Amino acid sequence: MQDLLNKIDRLLKEKKFFEVKNIVKDENAADLAVLFDELFGEVFGEKTEFMILFRLLPKDLAAETFAHMNSDMQSHLIQMFSDKEIRDILDESFIDDTVDIIEEMPANVVSRILKNSTTGERKAINEILRYPKDSAGSIMTIEYVSLHKDMTVSEAFEKIRKVGVNKETIYTCYVTENRKLIGVITVKDLFMADEDDKIADIMETHIISVDTLEDKEIVGHMFRKYDFLALPVVDKDNRLVGIVTFDDAMDVIQDENTEDFSKMAAIAPNEESYFRTGIFKHAKSRIVWLLILMISATITQIITNRYEAAFAAVPLLVSFMPMIMDTGGNCGAQSSTLIIRGIALDEIHFSDFFKVCLLYTSPSPRDT
């Protein structure tokens, strides 16, 4: 990556933009986002060079790269974009990615995004934003392929070809009647069927879905359990309102695991990345638990002081104290690691507190 950074830096300074364009056009969007992160404020001191590189990307690749960037870079670029460039990014972006961007941006940036959105896009954005932050509705997309049960396989393929280019996924299609979800069918099922077969005869009617207000952590658990590529989201009347895709579910799982690690390490969860969190925020996330641990250490010291006479009589006992305390700390670290792993794999829940305590305090038949 560093060699690529240096090469692009050199070519831009030499104004060999065509060569730069040929280099970046074949790169993966996620890799380009990492590249821009390295460039942001480091290799390029000039904002114009940063913008030149972004403008050399093809429109579709630029939009996908933009979606992978962190909020600081996105805000920086939007403030430098013309209205046409914002419009181009929105045209190539999925609605759920646009919503993610809006949620991270300051008010002045949000107003520019909404100003350059179409009426349909604003309606879709507002529809997702009205759901609670940690709900399934807040992470779904409304860009899915909907089929009718009376369609034939050939008609279904015709519709997929017609509307699929603007959908986030076309592998899993959803069969609806009066907006109500009645079946699910995959492209594989369609390929394996005859052209004249009816969708109603080959669709899967045993549907696993999630309510719009369900906690997004539950959505992550369902993806982990059922290996979904996409999960339908329905309202209380079983009307299909959107889908959660695999990439968004993975973000939820990563956030959940980060939160679990923070809690087990006695640190208040923080949504910002490590290097984008200031020293005062780092201190704020730790100070409460540090005070609690300090109080517990004080209690330990009080107990130790009560046996001061014993230590005076047998000084050798003092030499064992650091060893015993370190061993206890190491044992606690090992136990917390196992607990974190169990939580991450959904083997342990907070309701299992007493069950875990019993496991550590009593012998098990499995030990024999």
Features from the language model and the residues they span:
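Juxtamembrane loop-helix boundary motifs flanking transmembrane segments in multi-pass membrane proteins
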Residues: 131, 148, 207, 211, ...
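Non-transmembrane, extramembrane segments of multi-pass ion/lipid transporters
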Residues: 248-282, 333-358
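Single conserved hydrophobic/aromatic residue that forms the stacking wall/gate
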Residues: 360-368
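Core alpha-helical transmembrane segments of integral membrane proteins
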Residues: 280-344
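Alpha-helical membrane and juxtamembrane elements of multi-pass inner-membrane transport
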Residues: 87, 123, 133, 200, ...
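Hydrophobic packing positions in regular secondary-structure scaffolds
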Residues: 1-268
